[in-house]
Amino acid sequence: MPTYAPKAGDTTRSWYVIDATDVVLGRLAVAAANLLRGKHKPTFAPNVDGGDFVIVVNADKVAFSGQKLDKKLAYRHSGYPGGLRSRTIGELMQKHPDRVVADAIVGMLPKNKLSRQIQRKLRVYAGPEHPHTAQQPIPYEIKQVAQ
C-alpha cells in the first residue's frame, strides 16, 4: 500500500472556539497552535496547511504565571539608532489584550512559507462575543486552568 500524501483540498476545516478565561497563556497558545496546524488530525503533514480555524474569546481574562505581568517585557524597534522601546506585558494587556494572545499563538507556529496562511485562520477577541456564529464553532476545552 503506498504512503498517503495529503493535498491542500483533501481536508475539511472545522471552526473551534476557545474560552481563554483563567487559562495560562502558554498552554492556550500551544493548544491553539496545534489546532491551527492540524496536528490533531490523522492526515497531518508539515508541508500542507490542513489545520482548522480557531476563535479565541475573553483574551482579556487570560492568566499569567508568576510575575510576568509586571516583569516580562515586550520590545519593538523603530529602525533608528536608539529606537528600542519596551513595555511590560501588563501595560499591553490593558490596551490590546487580543494582540498579546495572538502574538503568543503566532510565536508557537513554524516560521516558513505556510506561516502567513496558517495565521489567517486565527481570530482573537478581547470580549466574550465573536461574529462567527454562522460557522457553528465547536467549543474546545483546555483542561488545565490557573490555580
Swiss-Prot record:
Q: Does the keyword Membrane apply?
A: no
Tell me, what is one Gene Ontology molecular-function annotation carried by this entry? structural constituent of ribosome
Q: What does this protein do?
A: This protein is one of the early assembly proteins of the 50S ribosomal subunit, although it is not seen to bind rRNA by itself. It is important during the early stages of 50S assembly.
Alphabetical list of InterPro entries matching this protein? Ribosomal_uL13, Ribosomal_uL13_bac-type, Ribosomal_uL13_CS, Ribosomal_uL13_sf
Q: Which family does it belong to?
A: Belongs to the universal ribosomal protein uL13 family.
Self-association and partners = Part of the 50S ribosomal subunit.
**One cellular component (GO) term of this entry:** cytosolic large ribosomal subunit
Q: Can you name the source organism?
A: Mycolicibacterium paratuberculosis (strain ATCC BAA-968 / K-10)
Task: Name the gene for this chain.
Answer: rplM
Q: Give the residue range of the signal peptide.
A: none
**Which UniProt keywords are present, listed alphabetically?**
Ribonucleoprotein, Ribosomal protein
The answer to keyword Methyltransferase applying to this record is no
**Could you identify this protein by its name?**
Large ribosomal subunit protein uL13
Q: According to the lineage, what is the superkingdom?
A: Bacteria
Q: Could you tell me the Gene Ontology terms of the biological process aspect for this record?
A: negative regulation of translation; translation
